[in-house]
């Protein structure tokens, strides 16, 4: 299988070594999340040895995906700290439109970006990155439905299945999930190998 990929700033010399990887990934959830965009990367990351903590507005609440698949929240977003995680996973669906209004979601997303930790977002998840104002001058992709929003927020929008610009990893739709999850796992493996080198 061949993929069209835009890669920027991912050479070994450009990578920053992050202190003490926790082997933990934070994922956001709320009602009407895109089922596959949460579960596919979550399962892949767990297969590779990462613990994925799914945080929603309320701990213990069971959130329903667009297709009805349930996801209980392991934690409350407002209690999460960037320092406790290696990366941020933001699935799409319509949940990001609600989550972007939560100051804790915006602050956490900015904190991951400021600490140069991977932020993997797909489909409508770009809405959260827009509200966090982390896309200005950066290459990224999304579902075509929010292309104008992304561009108006200063992103250099690229119509490709995977776009990596430094710590930002983005894909368009569920059809791009294989390459999306593979890229996030590869980035985390690189970070892990740099830490142990």
Predicted regions: what they are:
Residues 122-124:
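Short, thiol/selenol-centered motifs that function as redox-active sites or metal-ligating centers
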Residues 3-115, 119, 128-137, 147-197:
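Extended, subdomain-level signal for the structured scaffold at the beginning of enzyme domains
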Residues 140:
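Anionic-ligand binding patches
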Residues 143:
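Active-site-adjacent substrate-recognition loops and nearby beta-strands
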């Amino acid at each position: 299988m061949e993929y069209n990929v835009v890669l920027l700033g991912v050479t070994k010399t450009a990578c920053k070594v992050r202190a003490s990887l926790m082997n933990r990934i934070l994922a956001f959830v709320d009602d009407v999340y895109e089922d596959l965009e949460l579960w596919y990367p979550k399962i892949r990351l767990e297969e590779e040895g990462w613990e994925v903590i799914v945080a929603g507005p309320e701990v213990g609440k069971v959130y329903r995906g667009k297709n009805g698949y349930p996801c209980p929240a392991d934690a409350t977003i407002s209690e999460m700290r960037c320092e406790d995680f290696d990366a941020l996973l933001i699935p799409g669906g319509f949940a990001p439109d609600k989550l972007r209004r939560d100051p804790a979601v915006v602050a956490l997303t900015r904190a991951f970006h400021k600490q140069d930790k991977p932020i993997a977002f797909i489909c409508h998840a770009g809405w959260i990155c827009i509200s966090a104002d982390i896309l200005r001058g950066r290459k990224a992709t999304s579902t075509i439905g929010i292309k104008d929003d992304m561009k108006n927020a200063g992103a250099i929008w690229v119509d490709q299945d995977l776009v990596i610009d430094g710590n930002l990893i983005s894909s368009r739709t569920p059809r791009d999930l294989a390459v999306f999850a593979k890229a996030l796992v590869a980035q985390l493996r690189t970070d892990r190998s740099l830490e142990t080198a």
